[in-house]
A protein has these predicted regions:
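A conserved mid-protein helix/loop that constitutes part of the nucleotide-sugar donor-binding site
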Residues: 22, 225, 234-248, 425-428
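Short, acidic, metal-binding catalytic loop of nucleotide-sugar glycosyltransferases
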Residues: 432-441
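Aromatic "clamp/platform" in nucleotide-sugar-dependent glycosyltransferases that forms part
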Residues: 316
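A short, active-site helix/loop in glycosyltransferases that binds the activated sugar's phosphate group
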Residues: 157-194, 204
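Nucleotide-activated donor-binding/catalytic signature segment of Leloir-type glycosyltransferases, i.e.
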Residues: 274-303
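N-proximal low-complexity "stem/linker" segments adjacent to membrane-targeting elements
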Residues: 397-433
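Glycosyltransferase donor-sugar binding loop
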Residues: 257-276
Length: 445
Protein backbone atom coordinates (compact mmCIF):
# COMPACT_ATOMS: atom_id res chain seq x y z
CA UNK A 1 0.00 0.00 0.00
CA UNK A 2 1.09 3.58 -0.64
CA UNK A 3 2.76 5.72 1.99
CA UNK A 4 0.59 8.78 2.66
CA UNK A 5 1.36 11.98 4.56
CA UNK A 6 -1.47 14.17 5.77
CA UNK A 7 0.02 17.56 6.57
CA UNK A 8 -2.16 19.92 8.56
CA UNK A 9 -2.12 22.93 10.92
CA UNK A 10 -5.19 21.47 12.64
CA UNK A 11 -5.66 17.95 14.01
CA UNK A 12 -7.91 16.48 16.68
CA UNK A 13 -6.19 16.31 20.03
CA UNK A 14 -3.77 19.25 19.97
CA UNK A 15 -6.61 21.35 18.49
CA UNK A 16 -9.91 21.05 20.30
CA UNK A 17 -12.62 21.25 17.67
CA UNK A 18 -11.55 22.68 14.32
CA UNK A 19 -13.30 21.59 11.14
CA UNK A 20 -10.05 20.98 9.25
CA UNK A 21 -8.75 18.88 12.14
CA UNK A 22 -11.94 16.83 12.20
CA UNK A 23 -11.71 16.23 8.45
CA UNK A 24 -8.06 15.18 8.44
CA UNK A 25 -8.41 12.99 11.53
CA UNK A 26 -11.35 11.24 9.87
CA UNK A 27 -9.40 10.83 6.62
CA UNK A 28 -6.27 9.56 8.39
CA UNK A 29 -8.14 6.91 10.36
CA UNK A 30 -10.12 5.87 7.27
CA UNK A 31 -6.94 5.41 5.21
CA UNK A 32 -5.13 3.60 8.03
CA UNK A 33 -8.03 1.20 8.47
CA UNK A 34 -7.87 0.44 4.74
CA UNK A 35 -4.21 -0.51 5.13
CA UNK A 36 -2.38 2.59 3.93
CA UNK A 37 0.85 3.58 5.70
CA UNK A 38 -0.29 6.91 7.17
CA UNK A 39 1.75 9.67 8.79
CA UNK A 40 0.15 12.89 10.03
CA UNK A 41 2.41 15.94 10.25
CA UNK A 42 1.03 18.60 12.60
CA UNK A 43 2.61 21.85 11.41
CA UNK A 44 2.08 24.13 14.40
CA UNK A 45 4.91 22.87 16.55
CA UNK A 46 4.20 23.04 20.27
CA UNK A 47 0.83 24.81 19.96
CA UNK A 48 -1.85 22.85 21.77
CA UNK A 49 -5.32 23.52 23.13
CA UNK A 50 -5.31 20.27 25.09
CA UNK A 51 -4.80 20.77 28.81
CA UNK A 52 -5.20 17.13 29.77
CA UNK A 53 -2.80 15.51 27.27
CA UNK A 54 0.62 16.39 25.84
CA UNK A 55 1.55 15.99 22.19
CA UNK A 56 3.41 12.80 23.13
CA UNK A 57 0.20 11.49 24.68
CA UNK A 58 -1.70 12.19 21.47
CA UNK A 59 1.05 10.62 19.38
CA UNK A 60 0.72 7.46 21.44
CA UNK A 61 -3.09 7.51 21.12
CA UNK A 62 -2.91 7.90 17.34
CA UNK A 63 -0.42 5.03 17.12
CA UNK A 64 -3.04 2.68 18.55
CA UNK A 65 -5.09 3.38 15.41
CA UNK A 66 -2.20 2.74 13.03
CA UNK A 67 -1.22 6.39 12.52
CA UNK A 68 2.18 7.97 13.11
CA UNK A 69 1.51 11.49 14.48
CA UNK A 70 4.48 13.83 13.98
CA UNK A 71 5.03 17.55 14.47
CA UNK A 72 7.28 20.23 13.05
CA UNK A 73 7.84 23.87 13.88
CA UNK A 74 9.89 26.78 12.60
CA UNK A 75 13.47 26.02 11.62
CA UNK A 76 15.85 27.80 14.00
CA UNK A 77 19.12 27.26 12.12
CA UNK A 78 18.24 29.80 9.42
CA UNK A 79 17.36 33.44 10.03
CA UNK A 80 14.32 34.12 7.83
CA UNK A 81 13.12 37.72 7.87
CA UNK A 82 9.55 37.12 6.71
CA UNK A 83 5.98 36.78 8.04
CA UNK A 84 5.22 33.71 10.14
CA UNK A 85 3.35 31.84 7.41
CA UNK A 86 6.28 32.19 4.98
CA UNK A 87 8.83 31.05 7.56
CA UNK A 88 6.55 28.15 8.43
CA UNK A 89 6.05 27.08 4.82
CA UNK A 90 9.80 27.19 4.14
CA UNK A 91 10.50 25.19 7.31
CA UNK A 92 8.02 22.59 6.07
CA UNK A 93 9.83 22.43 2.71
CA UNK A 94 13.07 21.60 4.53
CA UNK A 95 11.30 18.91 6.57
CA UNK A 96 9.76 17.35 3.46
CA UNK A 97 13.12 17.30 1.66
CA UNK A 98 14.66 15.45 4.61
CA UNK A 99 11.70 13.05 4.72
CA UNK A 100 11.09 12.57 1.00
CA UNK A 101 9.54 9.10 1.32
CA UNK A 102 5.86 9.69 0.56
CA UNK A 103 3.86 8.59 -2.47
CA UNK A 104 1.05 11.04 -1.71
CA UNK A 105 0.93 14.19 0.41
CA UNK A 106 -2.45 15.68 1.34
CA UNK A 107 -2.85 19.14 2.84
CA UNK A 108 -5.21 22.11 2.78
CA UNK A 109 -4.82 25.59 1.33
CA UNK A 110 -5.34 27.37 4.68
CA UNK A 111 -2.06 28.93 5.94
CA UNK A 112 -0.30 27.90 2.69
CA UNK A 113 1.84 25.24 4.37
CA UNK A 114 2.58 23.60 1.00
CA UNK A 115 3.54 26.77 -0.89
CA UNK A 116 7.32 26.31 -1.07
CA UNK A 117 7.10 22.53 -1.49
CA UNK A 118 4.76 22.90 -4.46
CA UNK A 119 6.92 25.69 -5.87
CA UNK A 120 9.91 23.37 -5.63
CA UNK A 121 8.08 20.64 -7.54
CA UNK A 122 6.90 23.04 -10.23
CA UNK A 123 10.47 24.31 -10.62
CA UNK A 124 11.69 20.77 -11.18
CA UNK A 125 13.93 20.64 -8.12
CA UNK A 126 12.15 18.19 -5.80
CA UNK A 127 9.32 15.68 -5.29
CA UNK A 128 9.22 14.16 -8.77
CA UNK A 129 7.68 10.96 -7.41
CA UNK A 130 5.25 12.55 -4.96
CA UNK A 131 1.64 13.41 -5.73
CA UNK A 132 0.27 16.48 -3.94
CA UNK A 133 -3.46 16.59 -3.23
CA UNK A 134 -4.82 19.88 -1.89
CA UNK A 135 -8.02 19.21 0.05
CA UNK A 136 -9.62 22.66 0.04
CA UNK A 137 -11.44 23.72 3.18
CA UNK A 138 -11.30 27.49 3.72
CA UNK A 139 -8.80 29.99 2.41
CA UNK A 140 -8.17 33.12 4.48
CA UNK A 141 -9.70 35.29 1.76
CA UNK A 142 -12.86 33.18 1.77
CA UNK A 143 -13.13 33.36 5.57
CA UNK A 144 -12.44 37.11 5.65
CA UNK A 145 -15.20 37.71 3.12
CA UNK A 146 -17.58 35.74 5.32
CA UNK A 147 -16.62 37.79 8.36
CA UNK A 148 -16.78 41.08 6.42
CA UNK A 149 -13.14 41.53 7.39
CA UNK A 150 -10.71 43.65 5.38
CA UNK A 151 -7.06 42.53 5.20
CA UNK A 152 -5.09 43.68 8.23
CA UNK A 153 -1.91 44.60 6.34
CA UNK A 154 0.22 43.73 3.32
CA UNK A 155 1.20 40.41 4.89
CA UNK A 156 -2.45 39.41 4.80
CA UNK A 157 -2.54 40.11 1.06
CA UNK A 158 0.57 37.96 0.68
CA UNK A 159 -1.15 35.10 2.48
CA UNK A 160 -4.15 35.43 0.15
CA UNK A 161 -1.78 34.99 -2.79
CA UNK A 162 0.13 32.05 -1.32
CA UNK A 163 -3.06 30.14 -0.49
CA UNK A 164 -4.33 30.75 -4.03
CA UNK A 165 -1.07 29.45 -5.48
CA UNK A 166 -1.21 26.33 -3.29
CA UNK A 167 -4.47 25.45 -5.03
CA UNK A 168 -3.18 26.35 -8.50
CA UNK A 169 0.07 24.37 -8.15
CA UNK A 170 -1.57 21.22 -6.76
CA UNK A 171 -1.40 17.99 -8.74
CA UNK A 172 -5.02 17.38 -7.77
CA UNK A 173 -7.66 19.36 -5.90
CA UNK A 174 -10.34 17.71 -3.78
CA UNK A 175 -13.15 19.83 -2.37
CA UNK A 176 -15.97 18.64 -0.12
CA UNK A 177 -18.37 20.90 -2.06
CA UNK A 178 -18.92 22.08 -5.61
CA UNK A 179 -19.72 25.45 -4.06
CA UNK A 180 -16.09 26.07 -3.02
CA UNK A 181 -14.74 25.08 -6.43
CA UNK A 182 -17.20 27.51 -8.02
CA UNK A 183 -16.11 30.22 -5.56
CA UNK A 184 -12.46 29.77 -6.51
CA UNK A 185 -13.27 29.79 -10.22
CA UNK A 186 -15.34 32.92 -9.65
CA UNK A 187 -12.23 34.58 -8.21
CA UNK A 188 -10.35 33.60 -11.39
CA UNK A 189 -8.18 31.03 -9.65
CA UNK A 190 -6.60 28.61 -12.11
CA UNK A 191 -7.93 25.49 -10.40
CA UNK A 192 -6.30 22.35 -11.88
CA UNK A 193 -8.36 20.30 -14.32
CA UNK A 194 -7.78 17.32 -12.04
CA UNK A 195 -10.37 18.41 -9.47
CA UNK A 196 -13.04 16.39 -7.73
CA UNK A 197 -15.85 16.85 -5.22
CA UNK A 198 -15.57 14.28 -2.43
CA UNK A 199 -17.39 14.70 0.87
CA UNK A 200 -15.39 14.58 4.08
CA UNK A 201 -15.29 11.24 5.85
CA UNK A 202 -17.48 10.62 8.87
CA UNK A 203 -15.86 11.99 12.05
CA UNK A 204 -13.73 9.52 13.93
CA UNK A 205 -15.47 8.20 17.04
CA UNK A 206 -12.58 6.32 18.67
CA UNK A 207 -11.35 9.01 21.05
CA UNK A 208 -12.55 8.98 24.63
CA UNK A 209 -14.51 11.92 25.96
CA UNK A 210 -12.46 14.26 28.11
CA UNK A 211 -12.40 13.20 31.73
CA UNK A 212 -12.03 16.82 32.90
CA UNK A 213 -15.31 17.84 31.25
CA UNK A 214 -18.70 16.59 32.41
CA UNK A 215 -21.28 16.59 29.62
CA UNK A 216 -24.74 17.48 30.81
CA UNK A 217 -27.22 14.67 30.21
CA UNK A 218 -30.99 14.56 30.57
CA UNK A 219 -32.12 11.05 31.31
CA UNK A 220 -35.42 12.69 32.19
CA UNK A 221 -36.18 14.90 29.16
CA UNK A 222 -36.81 18.56 29.85
CA UNK A 223 -40.38 19.78 29.53
CA UNK A 224 -39.48 21.92 26.51
CA UNK A 225 -37.14 22.09 23.55
CA UNK A 226 -33.59 23.31 24.11
CA UNK A 227 -32.33 25.58 21.31
CA UNK A 228 -28.59 25.02 20.77
CA UNK A 229 -26.50 27.41 18.67
CA UNK A 230 -23.77 25.10 17.36
CA UNK A 231 -20.58 26.66 16.02
CA UNK A 232 -17.86 29.22 16.71
CA UNK A 233 -19.39 32.24 18.43
CA UNK A 234 -18.64 34.71 15.63
CA UNK A 235 -20.31 36.76 12.90
CA UNK A 236 -19.56 34.30 10.09
CA UNK A 237 -21.34 31.53 11.98
CA UNK A 238 -24.51 33.62 12.20
CA UNK A 239 -24.36 34.57 15.87
CA UNK A 240 -26.06 37.94 15.42
CA UNK A 241 -28.78 36.51 13.19
CA UNK A 242 -29.59 33.95 15.88
CA UNK A 243 -29.63 36.58 18.63
CA UNK A 244 -32.00 38.78 16.63
CA UNK A 245 -34.25 35.81 15.85
CA UNK A 246 -34.50 35.06 19.59
CA UNK A 247 -35.97 38.53 20.16
CA UNK A 248 -38.90 37.58 17.93
CA UNK A 249 -39.92 34.62 20.08
CA UNK A 250 -43.48 35.01 21.35
CA UNK A 251 -44.64 34.09 24.84
CA UNK A 252 -46.27 31.02 23.29
CA UNK A 253 -42.94 30.02 21.73
CA UNK A 254 -41.12 30.48 25.02
CA UNK A 255 -43.53 28.16 26.80
CA UNK A 256 -42.24 25.31 24.63
CA UNK A 257 -38.54 26.19 25.06
CA UNK A 258 -36.59 24.93 28.08
CA UNK A 259 -33.56 27.16 27.44
CA UNK A 260 -30.99 28.44 24.96
CA UNK A 261 -27.42 27.11 24.78
CA UNK A 262 -24.48 28.55 22.86
CA UNK A 263 -22.05 25.72 22.10
CA UNK A 264 -18.81 26.90 20.49
CA UNK A 265 -15.48 28.69 20.84
CA UNK A 266 -15.37 32.13 22.41
CA UNK A 267 -13.85 34.77 20.09
CA UNK A 268 -13.10 38.49 20.16
CA UNK A 269 -15.81 40.70 18.66
CA UNK A 270 -14.37 44.18 18.39
CA UNK A 271 -13.67 45.44 21.91
CA UNK A 272 -15.51 42.62 23.72
CA UNK A 273 -15.65 38.85 23.51
CA UNK A 274 -18.59 36.81 22.32
CA UNK A 275 -19.51 35.75 25.88
CA UNK A 276 -20.09 39.34 26.90
CA UNK A 277 -21.93 40.09 23.67
CA UNK A 278 -24.29 37.14 24.15
CA UNK A 279 -25.08 37.99 27.76
CA UNK A 280 -25.75 41.62 26.86
CA UNK A 281 -28.10 40.62 24.06
CA UNK A 282 -30.03 37.97 26.02
CA UNK A 283 -30.39 39.58 29.47
CA UNK A 284 -34.06 40.39 28.82
CA UNK A 285 -34.89 37.25 26.86
CA UNK A 286 -36.83 35.58 29.65
CA UNK A 287 -35.21 32.18 29.05
CA UNK A 288 -32.34 30.33 30.68
CA UNK A 289 -29.13 30.99 28.73
CA UNK A 290 -26.08 28.74 28.88
CA UNK A 291 -22.69 29.20 27.16
CA UNK A 292 -20.34 26.23 26.70
CA UNK A 293 -16.90 26.81 25.20
CA UNK A 294 -14.64 24.13 26.69
CA UNK A 295 -15.98 21.07 24.86
CA UNK A 296 -13.96 19.28 22.22
CA UNK A 297 -15.73 17.74 19.22
CA UNK A 298 -16.50 14.46 21.00
CA UNK A 299 -18.03 16.20 24.03
CA UNK A 300 -19.98 18.63 21.86
CA UNK A 301 -21.55 15.80 19.89
CA UNK A 302 -22.54 13.98 23.05
CA UNK A 303 -24.30 17.17 24.10
CA UNK A 304 -26.34 17.73 20.93
CA UNK A 305 -27.42 14.06 20.74
CA UNK A 306 -29.53 14.47 23.89
CA UNK A 307 -33.32 14.40 23.74
CA UNK A 308 -35.44 17.50 23.04
CA UNK A 309 -32.60 19.43 21.41
CA UNK A 310 -33.01 21.56 18.27
CA UNK A 311 -29.62 22.58 16.90
CA UNK A 312 -29.40 25.91 15.06
CA UNK A 313 -26.62 26.52 12.49
CA UNK A 314 -27.28 29.98 10.96
CA UNK A 315 -23.95 30.51 9.16
CA UNK A 316 -23.51 33.38 6.71
CA UNK A 317 -20.95 31.46 4.66
CA UNK A 318 -19.88 27.82 4.83
CA UNK A 319 -18.04 25.29 2.76
CA UNK A 320 -19.09 21.85 3.99
CA UNK A 321 -19.45 22.22 7.76
CA UNK A 322 -19.09 19.34 10.17
CA UNK A 323 -21.68 20.95 12.42
CA UNK A 324 -24.32 20.06 9.81
CA UNK A 325 -22.61 16.80 8.81
CA UNK A 326 -22.61 15.50 12.38
CA UNK A 327 -26.26 16.37 12.89
CA UNK A 328 -27.07 14.37 9.75
CA UNK A 329 -25.06 11.25 10.62
CA UNK A 330 -26.13 11.29 14.29
CA UNK A 331 -29.85 11.83 13.59
CA UNK A 332 -29.92 15.13 15.47
CA UNK A 333 -32.78 17.55 14.87
CA UNK A 334 -31.42 20.77 13.38
CA UNK A 335 -31.95 23.87 11.27
CA UNK A 336 -29.23 25.27 9.00
CA UNK A 337 -28.85 28.21 6.65
CA UNK A 338 -29.01 27.46 2.93
CA UNK A 339 -25.58 28.93 2.14
CA UNK A 340 -22.42 27.59 0.54
CA UNK A 341 -22.08 23.83 0.44
CA UNK A 342 -24.66 23.11 3.16
CA UNK A 343 -27.47 22.15 0.74
CA UNK A 344 -25.10 19.66 -0.94
CA UNK A 345 -25.02 17.63 2.30
CA UNK A 346 -28.80 17.24 2.59
CA UNK A 347 -31.20 15.22 0.40
CA UNK A 348 -33.15 17.61 -1.84
CA UNK A 349 -36.55 16.48 -0.57
CA UNK A 350 -35.76 17.74 2.95
CA UNK A 351 -34.41 21.19 2.05
CA UNK A 352 -37.68 23.01 2.75
CA UNK A 353 -37.93 21.50 6.24
CA UNK A 354 -34.41 22.07 7.56
CA UNK A 355 -32.93 24.97 5.56
CA UNK A 356 -33.59 28.69 5.86
CA UNK A 357 -32.34 31.94 4.39
CA UNK A 358 -29.91 33.50 6.92
CA UNK A 359 -32.12 36.36 8.08
CA UNK A 360 -33.65 36.81 11.54
CA UNK A 361 -37.19 36.72 10.12
CA UNK A 362 -36.74 33.49 8.15
CA UNK A 363 -34.87 31.81 11.00
CA UNK A 364 -37.57 32.72 13.48
CA UNK A 365 -40.23 31.33 11.14
CA UNK A 366 -38.39 28.00 10.90
CA UNK A 367 -37.86 27.84 14.69
CA UNK A 368 -41.57 28.50 15.23
CA UNK A 369 -42.44 25.69 12.78
CA UNK A 370 -39.95 23.19 14.19
CA UNK A 371 -41.00 23.75 17.80
CA UNK A 372 -44.23 22.03 16.72
CA UNK A 373 -42.56 19.61 14.26
CA UNK A 374 -39.23 18.82 15.86
CA UNK A 375 -38.52 15.29 14.61
CA UNK A 376 -37.15 15.72 11.08
CA UNK A 377 -33.94 13.77 10.46
CA UNK A 378 -32.98 13.63 6.77
CA UNK A 379 -29.65 11.78 6.98
CA UNK A 380 -26.50 12.47 4.94
CA UNK A 381 -26.90 12.67 1.16
CA UNK A 382 -24.08 10.17 0.49
CA UNK A 383 -23.18 6.82 2.04
CA UNK A 384 -19.89 6.42 3.89
CA UNK A 385 -18.99 3.53 1.59
CA UNK A 386 -19.18 5.80 -1.48
CA UNK A 387 -17.25 8.61 0.24
CA UNK A 388 -14.46 6.26 1.28
CA UNK A 389 -14.29 4.66 -2.16
CA UNK A 390 -13.89 8.10 -3.76
CA UNK A 391 -11.00 8.93 -1.41
CA UNK A 392 -9.28 5.61 -2.09
CA UNK A 393 -9.61 6.31 -5.82
CA UNK A 394 -8.01 9.74 -5.34
CA UNK A 395 -5.04 8.18 -3.53
CA UNK A 396 -4.57 5.55 -6.24
CA UNK A 397 -5.13 7.88 -9.20
CA UNK A 398 -1.99 8.38 -11.26
CA UNK A 399 -0.34 11.80 -11.14
CA UNK A 400 -0.60 13.06 -14.70
CA UNK A 401 1.18 16.36 -14.09
CA UNK A 402 4.36 16.94 -16.10
CA UNK A 403 7.52 17.18 -14.00
CA UNK A 404 9.93 19.68 -15.56
CA UNK A 405 13.38 18.24 -15.03
CA UNK A 406 16.30 20.64 -14.76
CA UNK A 407 18.77 20.47 -17.64
CA UNK A 408 22.06 20.07 -15.76
CA UNK A 409 24.08 20.83 -18.91
CA UNK A 410 22.46 24.23 -19.33
CA UNK A 411 23.77 26.49 -16.56
CA UNK A 412 23.53 30.12 -17.68
CA UNK A 413 25.11 32.94 -15.72
CA UNK A 414 22.64 34.52 -13.31
CA UNK A 415 23.30 38.16 -12.41
CA UNK A 416 21.92 39.24 -9.04
CA UNK A 417 21.59 43.02 -8.75
CA UNK A 418 21.19 44.29 -5.19
CA UNK A 419 20.12 47.84 -4.44
CA UNK A 420 20.95 49.13 -0.98
CA UNK A 421 21.52 52.31 0.95
CA UNK A 422 22.78 52.53 4.51
CA UNK A 423 21.33 49.15 5.49
CA UNK A 424 24.47 47.14 6.11
CA UNK A 425 22.82 44.43 8.19
CA UNK A 426 20.22 43.62 5.54
CA UNK A 427 22.87 43.69 2.81
CA UNK A 428 24.90 41.12 4.73
CA UNK A 429 21.80 38.93 5.03
CA UNK A 430 21.19 39.15 1.28
CA UNK A 431 24.78 38.24 0.44
CA UNK A 432 24.77 35.36 2.91
CA UNK A 433 21.58 34.04 1.31
CA UNK A 434 23.15 34.14 -2.16
CA UNK A 435 26.19 32.22 -0.89
CA UNK A 436 23.96 29.37 0.29
CA UNK A 437 22.28 28.88 -3.11
CA UNK A 438 22.75 25.43 -4.65
CA UNK A 439 23.12 27.01 -8.09
CA UNK A 440 26.72 28.21 -8.41
CA UNK A 441 26.96 30.17 -11.67
CA UNK A 442 26.05 33.50 -10.03
CA UNK A 443 27.50 36.98 -10.08
CA UNK A 444 26.54 39.84 -7.76
CA UNK A 445 26.49 43.50 -8.71
Amino acid sequence: MKKVLIMTPDIEGPVRNGGIGTAFTALATTLAKKGYDVDVLYTCGDYSESSASTFSDWSRIYSTFGINLLSTGLVKEINIDAPYFRRKSYSILLWLKENNVYDTIISCEWQADLYYALLSKKNGTDFENTKFIVNTHSSTLWADEGNYQLPYDQNHLELYYMEKMVVEMADEVVSPSQYLIDWMLGKHWNVPEERHVILNCEPFQGFETRSDVVVKTNETPASGVELVFFGRLETRKGLDIFLRALRKLSDEDKETISGVTFLGKNVTLGKIDSFTHIMNQTKNLGLAVNIISDYDRTNANEYIKRKNVLVIIPSLVENSPYTVYECLVNNVNFLASNVGGIPELIPQEHHAEVLFTPTPVDLYGKIHYRLKNINIKPGLVESQENIQAAWFAAIERKDNSVFKKIDESNRPLVSVCITHFDRHHLLQQALASIKTQTYQNIEVS
